[in-house]
Structures are given as C-alpha cells and as structure tokens.
C-alpha cells in the first residue's frame, strides 16, 4: 500500500485484530461518509479503510481527540446497503497501524504507519505458551454456556489451519470476553510474549469467574424452598387455565363473526380454514399470532356494508356552489358525472382526475362531491409512495405484513362505497420495490376492480362500488394510468375571483375561527385587493387566507390591548403596519414610450404577468444574444423573430447588410425567474423592429402571440389571465391572435370593457398598432 492517508471509521463496540474477518454495521453519518470516500487501490483493485475504537462508548459524534491512535488497516470485502440508510460491511483486518494527523468534519481521515510485531526469538517457549492458551480457551468455552458451539468450532478450525503464532494470538484475543479497553491494550502491545501472557491471564480469570458463577447459581437453586416452588407452579397453572379459557372465548367470537358477516364465498372458506388451523396451534407460537392478526384484519373489513347513497343533482349543485366560487365548467362536469350515477348505481366510465396548481380547491371539491352523494369521504395520500405493497399489501410471509392502503381506508370508514380521494397521484415514484402506479391500474379499471386481490388477504374484494377521484398538480402521469382517467383542468383563480372568495368565504371563516364579534373588525375591498397583489403570488388562495388570518390577529390584539377601541376598519393603509413591507409587485405599464422596449404578456401558475422585453444593438457580427433565464422555446422564438425581421429589412428602409455590423442583445428582466413558451413572438419581433428603426413602442400597448417565419400570428393559451394582468397594469390596448377571438366569451365583462382588444393575424398588423410611427417603406 503506497497510500499513506485513508478514510477513518470510529467503532463503538468492537476491537478488530489483524488477520480477523469481521462484519460491521454502519449507521452514523460520519461513518457512512468515510465509507463513501473509500477508493479502489491500484495495487490489488480493492478498497481499504482505517478502523479504530472510540474512547467513550456513548459518544454519538466523537472528536478526533476521542479516538485511539492505534488502529487497523482493513480491506473491504463486501458492502451491503440496507433500506434504512445504513450499511453492512465485511472487512479483513490487514495490519496494525499508528494514526497521525486525524482530521474530521464530514468524515474522519488520517495518515497511518504500519506497526510491525517484534520478532520471536524463543520459538519453543512461544509454542508452549500458545498451546496453553488454546487449551485454556477450549476449557473456558466448555464451562461457559454463553459461548456458542458454532463459534467454538469456527475458532478451533481457524487455529488448526494457522501456522503463525501471531495469527493464533490475534484469533484468541478477538474472541475474548473482556472489556474493550483491555482488548485495545492487547492491540497496542507489540511484544508477542506479553500479548500471549496477557491472553492466558485473561482466560484464567474468565475460567475462575465462570466456575464461581456456576457454583453460586447451584447454591441459590438449592436454597429455594419447596413451598415457594409449589406456589410458583400453582400460580402458573392458574395463568395457563385462564389463558385457555380466554382463547376459547376469542375463537368463539371469531367463529360468530364469520357466520354473521356477509363474506364472499371465497373469503368465508378462507376464514374457516384459517380458524381451523388456529385451533390446532400452540397459542404462544409466533405462527398463531400471524394467523390471529390475519383473521382480525379479514373480519374487520366492511364486507357487504354500504351507505344509503341517494343522489340529488339539484342538492349536489347547491353544495358545490355553497363551498366553491367560480369554477363553473368544473362544477358543470361534476354535475354531469353525478347525473349518470343517479340514473345508474355503478359507473363504467373513466375515473375523474382534477388537475391544477395547489390551493385551487381540488380536495374540497371531492369533499363536496361526497356530501352531495351522501357518502363517506376518505383520503389516500399518494405523494411520495414508491412501494407497490402500499397499494396491494404485503404477503403474509413477511414480518409485520399488513394489507394495502386501499383496504386500510375502507376498514377505517367502515363502508364499501365511500368516495375515495387519491391525492397527489402524480407524486408517486418507483424503485426496486415495484411501481405503485402499475398497481393502481387494477384498482381504477372498472372491468377489474370488482375482483381486486390484496396480497395480504389473498381473496377477492369488490371495489366497484367505491367512487375513486384523483387529484394532481401536473398532467404528467404514466400513460396507462392516464388512459383510465378523465382529466378536468382547474386553472388558477383570477384576481376578481380571489376577491369574491376572500370576501364571501375566507374573511368570515377567519372571523369565526378567531371568535371575532359582529362589527368588531372590517376589512375593506381595497385592502383585500392589495393583499392579493402585493402580499401573495399564487394560483389558489391558501396564502391569501393566511394573510387574512394574520390581519385578523393583529386587529384582535389591538382591541384586547386597548379597551377604548371597539372597532377597527382595516384598509390599504394598515397593511404595511400589520404585515410589513410589500412582498411582491405586479407589472405596470411603462411611464413613457420607449425605443427597443415592448410589453408582452405571460401566463404562469400564479396568473398573468406583464413581461417587459428590451433590446440593445452594438457593433458586432450580426449575432443575437438572449439573457433573462429564457427557456429553449423562447430562445427559438427570438431567433424566429430575428430571422423574420432580417427577411423584411428592406421593408423598413434598411439594407440587407446593415444588420451584419451589429449584434442584438435581447433581455427579459427578472433574470432569476425562468421564462419559456412561444407566445412572446410578437413582442420580440416588435422590440427588434423598434430598435433597428428607432421608432418607439406605445407604452399602453401590450401583445401576445406566436409568430412564424412568414410573419403569421398563431394562437396562444392563458388569454383570460393575460388580459387580467394587462387591465391591472394600466395597459389600454391588447393585441391578441385572431384565432383567440373565440376565447373572449370566457372573459369577464369588466375586463373586456377596461381594454381595447384588437385581433391580429400577421406582424404588419401588430406593428401598425404597436409602434408610434410606421416603419413601412421608410
């Protein structure tokens, strides 16, 4: 070994001697880091590590000064990673070493120098001492029942195969039952004669202690009086008799349950067979406990139990409108779904999957569906699930096995026809334990789930009466799972909807939660709008509810602190006092017309945004540069806009070779925020034309639309959110693709009235409305 520095692992409960092969369980972070830092030696293609004893057993994170300097250089034979972030390694102790320059922050590391054993000059004397030690160990092993017979056989085999006195001494020392400090002292001793005499002394001491302990135990047993033995046996008989009576009563209860429950034929036969097996078992055996747990689980399921579900779509619609503002299309589809269920007790159509950003009401919609159907609601959280057994259950052969989560939820709600929410179905993953998404296929398929077999139960259970509804934040689902679902997309709330939700739902809810009396606190509409604009940035209303709660608490504190204050009216002026400085800003129109700066419109998870696009030209080679953390699609859109401009350069009074002398740098501010998508094409093109022709862009005009190389304007998404952002930011005119005119019917009237919305089909129309002057034929 040429390497003089290696990772170092501290041991708490063992001292390893050279020549010994030993298993080690690794669980502490520093030890795992040291293990991960090991590298393959160039000499023999093996990994090596240093191991040493720590001075204090109970020290979880010892310092470098709390480690012994005499250690072992070990070859790593095998590494087995365990599921609970630990590992088991098998090492072969190669040599005893002296440590120096021990360092340890994330993992210990040290320099080392091999310590040779002193030479044995009196071989005959050493042979005599070693033979004596081997005989003493055999005697000790026979006397002391604590030493396992297999260990004795292994040690004797190792000793008989070894011709090296040092190896035999190390083998005996490693199996001595003595303190860790004593073993460490043996390891540090370089004289073979001193080490073997110490081993012999320890063995003699162990033999004397063992014989003394055995004699003492024999004397104590003889001192037990006959009356005490009789009393003990009598009490034991009473306990056994009581246990037998209890077992008979318990088995009778199980038998009665089997007869009374509406089990399927298969389940009843299985239960009777398991009960028959249980009667013949020793009630104290482990197998008896496994069988008893199985029967208890099987009989606790709601076999044949159904809630009286009576669907009234008018009542269901009232419940949905009561609990949710807006979401008209979503509620309409849910009512259609319930209408089919009202006419047919079972639905064979696809499973509903509500997809949308956090906080838009997906979970509460499912609760309202359950209430509207008159069924119990249960939730199965699938986020982070990566084990197939959590869906299908564990087989009985495994220790601690149990049924899957599907049957676990039915057991919890005590009915076979609940509404079950499969929450965060897109957050499942897979690993070596299987793919839970594949396990869900049988659960969600109406043609198969009436014969669902849990691995633990091993009998069929009918899931066809369960209404499964899934939720997800992303539409990126496994193909097979996606095919079994009808996706209903729930977009983020627009500002007006958030205002109505806050005024009609969130404020009353927070007042009720904080026990606010009538007329004690009022929150103005402008204050709520400022909360939405400057203190939250989200698709849903969770953060808005938290901020309203914070406002309520601040106001309540003032009322309770000052008895003269009877009423607090919270308006926009109170927000910074109660909640601190503004957290966010929404985009505003430019203050004046700019050259090379255009206002685009973006659609994000949290709504619409104004997107400023600016450009500069400077001497160069005709290249285009983009900054602002733009995605690949947006970069390609910029290239398309530049190519379209170059092809029309003569239309703007520019020569074909003008652009060759300039580089154009396009930047989209808020550089830390990723931006992507093709809908900024119009704005990018307008920015380049304005820059090169020196014609300003109207500051009150915003635009959205993808462009082609031929200058056509293509449709975009998120029109509603983009128009809302334009109205909020002081924009007067918005240019939209002609193909998006059909989407204007979904835009609130107040938004359409506040904006001049112009449809365009090509970039010439865009430039006509966007630029202060016209560059055509200049």
UniProtKB/Swiss-Prot annotation:
<protein>
    <recommendedName>
        <fullName>Lon protease</fullName>
        <ecNumber>3.4.21.53</ecNumber>
    </recommendedName>
</protein>
<keyword id="KW-0547">Nucleotide-binding</keyword>
<keyword id="KW-0067">ATP-binding</keyword>
<feature type="binding site">
    <location>
        <begin position="356"/>
        <end position="363"/>
    </location>
    <ligand>
        <name>ATP</name>
    </ligand>
</feature>
<dbReference type="InterPro" id="IPR003111">
    <property type="entry name" value="Lon_prtase_N"/>
</dbReference>
<feature type="domain" description="Lon N-terminal">
    <location>
        <begin position="6"/>
        <end position="207"/>
    </location>
</feature>
<dbReference type="GO" id="GO:0006515">
    <property type="term" value="P:protein quality control for misfolded or incompletely synthesized proteins"/>
</dbReference>
<dbReference type="InterPro" id="IPR003593">
    <property type="entry name" value="AAA+_ATPase"/>
</dbReference>
<dbReference type="InterPro" id="IPR027543">
    <property type="entry name" value="Lon_bac"/>
</dbReference>
<dbReference type="InterPro" id="IPR008269">
    <property type="entry name" value="Lon_proteolytic"/>
</dbReference>
<feature type="domain" description="Lon proteolytic">
    <location>
        <begin position="592"/>
        <end position="773"/>
    </location>
</feature>
<dbReference type="GO" id="GO:0005737">
    <property type="term" value="C:cytoplasm"/>
</dbReference>
<dbReference type="InterPro" id="IPR020568">
    <property type="entry name" value="Ribosomal_Su5_D2-typ_SF"/>
</dbReference>
<dbReference type="InterPro" id="IPR008268">
    <property type="entry name" value="Peptidase_S16_AS"/>
</dbReference>
<dbReference type="Pfam" id="PF22667">
    <property type="entry name" value="Lon_lid"/>
</dbReference>
<dbReference type="GO" id="GO:0004252">
    <property type="term" value="F:serine-type endopeptidase activity"/>
</dbReference>
<dbReference type="GO" id="GO:0005524">
    <property type="term" value="F:ATP binding"/>
</dbReference>
<feature type="active site">
    <location>
        <position position="679"/>
    </location>
</feature>
<dbReference type="Pfam" id="PF02190">
    <property type="entry name" value="LON_substr_bdg"/>
</dbReference>
<dbReference type="InterPro" id="IPR046336">
    <property type="entry name" value="Lon_prtase_N_sf"/>
</dbReference>
<dbReference type="InterPro" id="IPR054594">
    <property type="entry name" value="Lon_lid"/>
</dbReference>
<keyword id="KW-0378">Hydrolase</keyword>
<keyword id="KW-0645">Protease</keyword>
<dbReference type="GO" id="GO:0034605">
    <property type="term" value="P:cellular response to heat"/>
</dbReference>
<dbReference type="InterPro" id="IPR027065">
    <property type="entry name" value="Lon_Prtase"/>
</dbReference>
<dbReference type="InterPro" id="IPR027417">
    <property type="entry name" value="P-loop_NTPase"/>
</dbReference>
<feature type="active site">
    <location>
        <position position="722"/>
    </location>
</feature>
<dbReference type="GO" id="GO:0016887">
    <property type="term" value="F:ATP hydrolysis activity"/>
</dbReference>
<comment type="subunit">
    <text>Homohexamer. Organized in a ring with a central cavity.</text>
</comment>
<dbReference type="InterPro" id="IPR014721">
    <property type="entry name" value="Ribsml_uS5_D2-typ_fold_subgr"/>
</dbReference>
<dbReference type="InterPro" id="IPR003959">
    <property type="entry name" value="ATPase_AAA_core"/>
</dbReference>
<dbReference type="Pfam" id="PF05362">
    <property type="entry name" value="Lon_C"/>
</dbReference>
<dbReference type="InterPro" id="IPR004815">
    <property type="entry name" value="Lon_bac/euk-typ"/>
</dbReference>
<dbReference type="GO" id="GO:0043565">
    <property type="term" value="F:sequence-specific DNA binding"/>
</dbReference>
<comment type="similarity">
    <text>Belongs to the peptidase S16 family.</text>
</comment>
<keyword id="KW-0963">Cytoplasm</keyword>
<keyword id="KW-0346">Stress response</keyword>
<dbReference type="GO" id="GO:0004176">
    <property type="term" value="F:ATP-dependent peptidase activity"/>
</dbReference>
<dbReference type="InterPro" id="IPR015947">
    <property type="entry name" value="PUA-like_sf"/>
</dbReference>
<dbReference type="Pfam" id="PF00004">
    <property type="entry name" value="AAA"/>
</dbReference>
<comment type="function">
    <text>ATP-dependent serine protease that mediates the selective degradation of mutant and abnormal proteins as well as certain short-lived regulatory proteins. Required for cellular homeostasis and for survival from DNA damage and developmental changes induced by stress. Degrades polypeptides processively to yield small peptide fragments that are 5 to 10 amino acids long. Binds to DNA in a double-stranded, site-specific manner.</text>
</comment>
<keyword id="KW-0720">Serine protease</keyword>
